[in-house]
Amino acid sequence: MILDADYITEDGKPIIRIFKKENGEFKVEYDRNFRPYIYALLRDDSAIDEIKKITAQRHGKVVRIVETEKIQRKFLGRPIEVWKLYLEHPQDVPAIRDKIREHPAVVDIFEYDIPFAKRYLIDKGLTPMEGNEKLTFLAVDIETLYHEGEEFGKGPVIMISYADEEGAKVITWKKIDLPYVEVVSSEREMIKRLIRVIKEKDPDVIITYNGDNFDFPYLLKRAEKLGIKLLLGRDNSEPKMQKMGDSLAVEIKGRIHFDLFPVIRRTINLPTYTLEAVYEAIFGKPKEKVYADEIAKAWETGEGLERVAKYSMEDAKVTYELGREFFPMEAQLARLVGQPVWDVSRSSTGNLVEWFLLRKAYERNELAPNKPDEKEYERRLRESYEGGYVKEPEKGLWEGIVSLDFRSLYPSIIITHNVSPDTLNREGCEEYDVAPKVGHRFCKDFPGFIPSLLGQLLEERQKIKKRMKESKDPVEKKLLDYRQRAIKILANSILPDEWLPIVENEKVRFVKIGDFIDREIEENAERVKRDGETEILEVKDLKALSFNRETKKSELKKVKALIRHRYSGKVYSIKLKSGRRIKITSGHSLFSVKNGKLVKVRGDELKPGDLVVVPGRLKLPESKQVLNLVELLLKLPEEETSNIVMMIPVKGRKNFFKGMLKTLYWIFGEGERPRTAGRYLKHLERLGYVKLKRRGCEVLDWESLKRYRKLYETLIKNLKYNGNSRAYMVEFNSLRDVVSLMPIEELKEWIIGEPRGPKIGTFIDVDDSFAKLLGYYISSGDVEKDRVKFHSKDQNVLEDIAKLAEKLFGKVRRGRGYIEVSGKISHAIFRVLAEGKRIPEFIFTSPMDIKVAFLKGLNGNAEELTFSTKSELLVNQLILLLNSIGVSDIKIEHEKGVYRVYINKKESSNGDIVLDSVESIEVEKYEGYVYDLSVEDNENFLVGFGLLYAHNSYYGYYGYAKARWYCKECAESVTAWGRQYIDLVRRELEARGFKVLYIDTDGLYATIPGVKDWEEVKRRALEFVDYINSKLPGVLELEYEGFYARGFFVTKKKYALIDEEGKIVTRGLEIVRRDWSEIAKETQARVLEAILKHGNVEEAVKIVKDVTEKLTNYEVPPEKLVIYEQITRPINEYKAIGPHVAVAKRLMARGIKVKPGMVIGYIVLRGDGPISKRAISIEEFDPRKHKYDAEYYIENQVLPAVERILKAFGYKREDLRWQKTKQVGLGAWIKVKKS
């Protein structure tokens, strides 16, 4: 049995090593005769002699082709002749391949990126895990004093536990008197003992849970610090760490390091993937969790070490049990795809399919297509296709429900209609299958490459399932089940209204992404490139806010292109705990953190409780801001700027304007040279229009000078002398068409205002006084005809407003509860700058002190900001502004059309990115354009309500953007047929008296109204399955999945059912996070039971009312009110002081150590102020002294847990609360809809 394969180098040549188990013994086989190679397709075979001469350099060594061979292959089913180019060493391939590809005679090169040892297994037809050898297993787990946020490997390893079929043991270096504990003298001796244990037991498989990213990297770090070589390999080598995507992977030579964590993440869907949660989900048994702070306390004090040792032992034991449960399926997958378990267990489904296809392609003499380069990959990512059909659920409580499901719908469609890249639109075929709606044709004259392989897989799976039914041997049954599950794994493998901040010409503005891209594409239609249905507009002067995934720093990056394409399918409406939200397709991703690494997570992969990256601190360009008042006035209608004048003192300018115009006429050859022309020529030179010569001047820009002449002609025509002010005066409206032509140097000399009113300069320096006044206006100001009013009940605030306004505009009027500033200029400034109560764009790029002053005016206190508005735009602007000064602790609430934004403390965030958790996900149907930006380097951008970082992604194998056999037409054809067949089933069902309650892609739920005999419903459903299967083509098959006594459907992906044995099945309704109290979880469970088991909605409502009554009357025991939240970082890094952080701080004040990983349990008390000030630990709670906050638990715990269920029956939140006056509930009129 082959366990693994690699290669080593001797004398510059590669030697393949095959690690095997044979007749119970471990052995290594060597092959010195296998050489690396690539394929090259040439335009002209005569060029092969030139190709042979190509050389490259690798570490000072000359790399060259050592042998060539012309061979016959097929490419996408068509015969092709290619050259096989042999090289001396596997590392020669990346060194020389680009030079070969760049030769003019080379069309392309192929199969140059298949690792050498994997290539060997494929070419030699060797299959890992084949045979009946008995493997030995050992699970390993460690306990450390490391805490998240500390230097990795700084704290010691305090316990190492291991488990095998003989039992579990713990090694430690503190005295613990337990039979399974071995005590050594030091950490160093403990690690050396582990090395001896592994050598003595000599396991074939070492099982860990997150050993790739924690246990082994940590052990390696500690061993290095302690001067030990961690020699665990069968070749006496140390574990080898390597990067694998966003994570690490650890290899132990000669042994299979089987890390359960990636396997379980790929295999089962859970709300959390702690070892305890996984064990309970798989085996149905709870496992105690001992938290990091408890371990640290026990180690420091010596009290409770026995509990920690037991926990460590159970970790190893549980890891061993889980490993034995999951390893057989991974072994079967390894046999199927022909690659070692180490690789298979760390591969995505897409990669598993790829390895399977590569092996089968070699067997069939097919040349594998290349993976896409970055440009092609980006193009594929922009492509989209309509997904499966989803029917909106029928509301209400239903009985007698059958579940029908297509067996392997998409693989069956691929086989039935021969959907494959090599059959797509193939010319000269006698028979084609044409995909509905999309119209792609697939040749039926020969079996396609992928359909034929899928056919074999599904046929094999059906044979196995048949053998499972016939087998009496439980061991054989289990092995067969693992194989059929492995086959199943292999066989199935941003919207217009979102807010987008963009930076253009160093100015920040918010746009709706759809409106913006639509307008840009329509206005620049001649520059738009089309790739299928995708429209791409390349842009130059646009920037987007993004972050660098390596440095985790905010960056302002160029936008390379605006992109849109048609889409019809699912969109995911994602709401975060902070109140942020976004709608994305399953082809777009947000960013999350897994195992300390940033990773992309698609919309269809996210689930409540997941962490999502949002901005903590944003870097915007900052500079001193100056407002041009003339530009503001030009934005107003002409009637609103009537009676506004511009003035300039006469002193020093007598006859200047006439003299300048005469000089300009002379320059243009339309008059004589004025006697005083020199004065005006010097002025024109200062402005950059001319260059003075000994006799006259040289005009540098005739067009600009012509416009300048037009300005002066208009000035002379309209200029008047005002004797009282000894100034020239001109009406602003008379200059509207030309005032923008006035050079800034001249414009600065003018003042502006009403003839008899105060005047101000044409340029306003944005200082902290002006910024604060703007903040006051947005918060409480309004404009009327020719006046601005600021309102406040606080006299101190009014006095501050008055002082700031007088500084800029002169005298103000004080009224009761308001300050009034009269005049058209003040009206114009606030009307234009803050139109619609938005934050002026220049505030975002102002220096920090200006932003802070603005926020103080907006809220009166920038330290603890609270702000309410009905404007989505203003909410987004405010969040961007707060992020730009480093404030990330932001919460958004929305109630009755009003948004409320608040922060707990204005402090700088320590990081440019922070994490927010997903609160809810709604799936909706959408048809129309979806939009995207291509952003330089980072390929992510800030978008959505409340601002999140978004990125593109992919789904499906044919639609998997990195796939070699990528085929967008195949993917959209498969889903089109899928929609057609599920709709056919729906129509046929309804024609036979069934009512379809809900459809999602490949399955549906239905009942027969009026039929009370459930056996008849089942019988008719089974008859229908036989009938429809007789009509379905090919291998398509509808299956009877089960029967449910009762159920209800809230929205898509949210429903609850109960089977005949009383087992409740829910989807999308569960509350499983720690921050739900027991009373909330218990109430939801009782509500589901009342509705599903008893069929009584009114009983469910009564349960809720009873609970709210008990809460109101303080009759709920405190242990049911505890809310648990985990400390995820050092306390001093928290900017938002949530209740768990506040409690943690009080614990620290009492001398209790609080570190990341510690879970804080707290109860919220009655009282005023934020809940962080009213939360106390469960240990502190004394029922004689304390009263919990009943309103908090009703509104934030119990009602949210049940509201999502009962709204399906027409109930609103207010219907569910206990009230002293008895009311009749809606349930009195809701009848169970029986079959």
UniProtKB/Swiss-Prot annotation:
Alphabetical GO biological process terms: DNA-templated DNA replication; intein-mediated protein splicing
Reaction it catalyzes: DNA(n) + a 2'-deoxyribonucleoside 5'-triphosphate = DNA(n+1) + diphosphate
Residues covered by the DOD-type homing endonuclease domain: 773-887
Entry comment on modification after translation: This protein undergoes a protein self splicing that involves a post-translational excision of the intervening region (intein) followed by peptide ligation.
The enzyme's E.C. designation: 2.7.7.7
SUPFAM superfamilies reported in the protein's UniProt record: DNA/RNA polymerases, Hedgehog/intein (Hint) domain, Homing endonucleases, Ribonuclease H-like
MF terms in GO: DNA binding; DNA-directed DNA polymerase activity; endonuclease activity; nucleotide binding
Pfam families cross-referenced by the UniProt entry: DNA_pol_B, DNA_pol_B_exo1, Intein_splicing, PI-TkoII_IV
Gene3D superfamilies the UniProt entry points to: DNA polymerase family B, C-terminal domain, DNA Polymerase, chain B, domain 1, Hedgehog/Intein (Hint) domain, Homing endonucleases, Intein homing endonuclease, domain IV, Palm domain of DNA polymerase, Ribonuclease H-like superfamily/Ribonuclease H
Annotated keywords: Autocatalytic cleavage, DNA replication, DNA-binding, DNA-directed DNA polymerase, Nucleotidyltransferase, Protein splicing, Transferase
Similarity comment text for this entry: Belongs to the DNA polymerase type-B family.
Protein's recorded name: DNA polymerase
Organism annotation: Pyrococcus horikoshii (strain ATCC 700860 / DSM 12428 / JCM 9974 / NBRC 100139 / OT-3)
Name of encoding gene: pol
